[in-house]
Amino acid sequence: MAHPHVRVTRRQALRTAAGALFIPFTLRSGKAPAQGGRKPFDGVTLNISCWSATYPKLIADYLPEFQEKTGIKVNYDTPGFPVYNQRADLELSTKGSGFDVLNVTFIYTSRWIGAGWLTPLDPFIADANKTPADWDFADFVPGSVQPMRDKAGAVYGIPWISDVLIAAAARFDLLAANGFGMPDTLDELEKALQVVNKKDGASGFITENHWGWIYPAYLQAFGGNVFRNPPDDLMPTLDTPEAAAAAETLARLLNSYGPEAAAGYTYDQVTEALRAGRIIYSTHNHAFCALLGEEGSKVTKTSNFSMIPKGPKGRFPGVASHGWGIPVGAKNKDASWEFIKWSLSRDLIQRMTQKHGLGSVTRKSLIGSADYKQRMVINGIDTGRLFLDSIAMSEQGYMKYRTVHVYPQANAQITQALGRIISGQMKAKESLALAQANTIADLKRAGVRF
């Protein structure tokens, strides 16, 4: 356990970083606050943060509308995923008032909700004076909302995305020209990559370096899992032959067919490399893959998509929800709810899908609309259907490992273990044995009994 003075120093450093990253949208947009009649929340300022992805970055462009409507000023930032989670977890643990709205990260839902660090949202949803009937909470996909509930069913987050791992071949033309279709299995994928890698200057394979998100899909495809039987039995199972085989496969795909420094690619870098046609094939999130069909993409007419390839034991596409929540220490929760309501209104999300091709939305009425379905068809492939089919597969329950309260500790150990394997620092069996031992120790410190 860290000593108190170390914890304070770390917290101060993170909050200093947070201050440096916060950009009041009125300054960024160059627009002055609205003039004229008094707004409902004039004089209120909200501090809001979310990890960097398509939707939260788009929100920044629309914030002037929110201030015009409500009078609320917003300090808003979107750091990278690891930085955001570290900062949010630390701030929430103090029950402080530094943030008024935060993203409820999927892997932290059990920890943050179970610890009482977030505000229940049911009273806001049920109050007709705060939430009009046409906002329609029931319109959100139930599977996206479920991780945001506690054991009693109370809601602590409103989902803005369901992350779904799919397969994208930005240069499917190279696969087709060499007699290959979209690979259905990992074996088929590797056979194809052996032929097409480096053709027309394109590297064969890439995936983002959040190994705690990417690796479990490969792990389960080989018949392994992170825990023995989550959520009831949390004994880690990272040192199995299946775990080693999955890690060796992922490392080989990156090292044999990836670009230079493949192990360092973030999700944004993967997306841009695909859009530029520098990568032939990737297992990547649907929300990012949807951008292959948007303005600026060089591969709209050469792209193809499918569910992720299956391994010896099947196909297990990663599915995860993220949503807006209100920290228990937020000073003006009514204003916080106004932001959540506005940012997830049907009108705003619909405009984002129509203008920017926003994918992986969470409102049923939009997913089922003709406009959205058409927008999600890229080069003749219905990526929206792949999204829905992947979510349906997750109803088998294989994502349970990800919402137990101690998964963040396992996530950290997986990330370190895969980093050692892919870099060649350690063999898979050796690295995963170390991850197993470290995860058991971390879970014991967190109070898990074996």
Spans of features found by a protein language model:
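N-terminal secretory signal peptides
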Residues: M1-T9, G19-L21
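Extracytoplasmic/periplasmic solute-binding protein
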Residues: I23, V145-S162, I166, E190-P236, ...
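Hinge/lid segment of periplasmic solute-binding proteins
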Residues: G36-P40, F106-L165, T302-S306
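Conserved C-terminal helix/tail region of periplasmic/extracytoplasmic solute-binding proteins
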Residues: K39-F41, K73-V74, A176, A392-F450
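Short, solvent-exposed loop/beta-turn-alpha elements that line the ligand-binding surface or hinge
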Residues: K39-G43, D122-F140, G224-A247, E294-K298, ...
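Extracytoplasmic "Venus flytrap"/periplasmic binding protein-like
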Residues: P64-F140, D173, A177-D184, G277-Y281
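C-terminal lobe and pocket-closing loops
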Residues: A126, A287-T300, G311-Q413, F450
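Glycine-centered hinge/linker elements that transmit conformational signals in sensory
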Residues: A192-N197, D232-G264, I308
